[in-house]
């Protein structure tokens, strides 16, 4: 599945990035509602687990009127940011865009579900 959000968003601290468009639909193991920041991964498999590769890439900046400082994002599983996916960018000025990306493999046990998101974890 590929989901995108091409319009500029202001994402508050501890809030999720919202994905507005489903470019490529997944299968019944991946569920997303356009406009939501949550994606549900379901362990629909005949094996003991279903493995998913989750990746994120995006351009980030400090909005006009903001204070220059580090911006931190992370892929979150069930609302908890995964430390190894932390993406940090420190623009020199407001409205200076920089690119960040991260990826993670997730194992979802058979019959279980997990929700993933990309969260602003800046202080």
Residue ranges and their predicted role:
Residues 1-53, 59-66:
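Terminal (often C-terminal
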């Amino acid at each position: 599945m590929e989901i995108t959000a091409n319009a500029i968003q202001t994402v508050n601290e501890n809030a999720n990035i919202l994905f507005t468009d489903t470019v490529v639909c997944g299968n019944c193991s991946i569920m997303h509602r356009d406009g939501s920041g949550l994606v549900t991964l379901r362990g629909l498999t005949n094996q003991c687990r279903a493995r998913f590769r989750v990746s994120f890439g995006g351009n980030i900046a400090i909005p006009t009127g903001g204070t220059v400082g580090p911006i931190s994002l992370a892929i979150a599983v069930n609302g908890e940011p995964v430390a190894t996916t932390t993406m940090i960018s420190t623009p020199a000025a407001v409205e200076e865009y920089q690119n960040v990306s991260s990826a993670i493999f997730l194992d979802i046990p058979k019959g279980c579900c997990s929700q993933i998101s990309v969260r602003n974890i800046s202080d």
